[in-house]
Amino acid sequence: MTQEIFNIDYNFLNLFPLTLHHLQIDEFENKKQELIKFAYNLRETTNCTHNSNKGGWQSNVYKVNGDNFLESLLLNIFKSIPAFNDKIELESFYWLNINPTGAYNTKHNHPNSDLAGVLWLKIPKDSGDIVFISPKDFESFIELFSYTDEFKKKTNNYHIYNFPPKEGTMLVFPSFLQHKVEENKSNDDRISVSFNIKIKHEHFTMR
């Protein structure tokens, strides 16, 4: 029997999108050295925590109150995200990460918060992408094998997604989303600021 190929009018609809907010910080180059100096000074004067980090340095967690240059910058950035309406209040906490050669972050998410994110301060070439893992179930993972590469690229339909970091940019994403940071294969430090955000509203609290 000869197989007949039909011409069809084809469309698709993506439901329930998982939104990541990508921001470019204006005039970052004017602030870069001060931010990097702040990170190194903090490493010299405070204890190290490890959590998901392997081989690198993580600071303690601090509430964003606007008490220093970095906190003021974070507050101003959060207030400038156009997707957020003016009825919410954001309570945020941050920590710094310095990954030398060979350091990486294992798979994790950010519990007890609504959003998580990262601001990249120093990103040498080959210092490691942030890698997101799909929260979909195993059946959806199997479904991906049926799609063409072109369709997966067009719809961002992947099981894992490598996002290349860039200095002076920020990424904000749902805190439940599993992610990891690849090994730093450069000969220099990779420096970033991670943060958690709790969303408060007069009618509800997401968490």
Q: What spans do the regions from the language model cover?
A:
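Non-heme Fe(II)/2-oxoglutarate
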Residues: 2-86, 104
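Short conserved micro-motifs at the rims of enzyme active sites and ligand-binding pockets
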Residues: 34, 184, 204-207
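Catalytic core of non-heme Fe(II) oxygenases with the double-stranded beta-helix
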Residues: 99-172, 189, 202-206
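Histidine-centered metal-chelating micro-motifs
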Residues: 103-104, 176-180
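Short beta-strand segments enriched in hydrophobic/aromatic residues
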Residues: 121, 177, 197-199
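Ligand-binding loop in jelly-roll beta-barrel domains
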Residues: 182-192
